[in-house]
From Swiss-Prot:
Record's function text: Rod linker protein, associated with allophycocyanin. Linker polypeptides determine the state of aggregation and the location of the disk-shaped phycobiliprotein units within the phycobilisome and modulate their spectroscopic properties in order to mediate a directed and optimal energy transfer.
Span of domain CpcD-like: 2-57
Top-level taxonomic group: Bacteria
Organism name: Nostoc sp. (strain PCC 7120 / SAG 25.82 / UTEX 2576)
Organism phylogeny: Bacteria, Bacillati, Cyanobacteriota, Cyanophyceae, Nostocales
PROSITE patterns documented for this protein: CPCD_LIKE
Listed name of the protein: Phycobilisome 7.8 kDa linker polypeptide, allophycocyanin-associated, core
The entry's keywords: Antenna complex, Membrane, Photosynthesis, Phycobilisome, Thylakoid
Gene name of this polypeptide: apcC
Length: 68
């Protein structure tokens, strides 16, 4: 069973804007596997977004820190 992070993020949506001053934000929550976490984090930040919350969705807490 792989570890999954449940992330909540806010990304500006450029496709739905009618004027230059108006900016719509897309708010979403998704599950990201531990292996893809860094890539997903980079993607959100490059798009000008903000990561609001990160939780461990599955897997044992502290596994990566060597705790049993």
């Amino acid at each position: 069973m792989s570890r999954l992070f449940k992330i909540t993020a806010l990304v500006p949506s450029l496709s739905r804007t009618r004027t230059q001053r108006e900016l719509q934000n897309t708010y979403f929550t998704k599950l990201v596997p531990y292996e893809n976490w860094f890539r997903e984090q980079q993607r959100i930040q490059k798009a000008g977004g903000k990561i609001i919350k990160v939780e461990l969705a599955t897997g044992k807490q502290g596994t990566n820190a060597g705790l049993q």
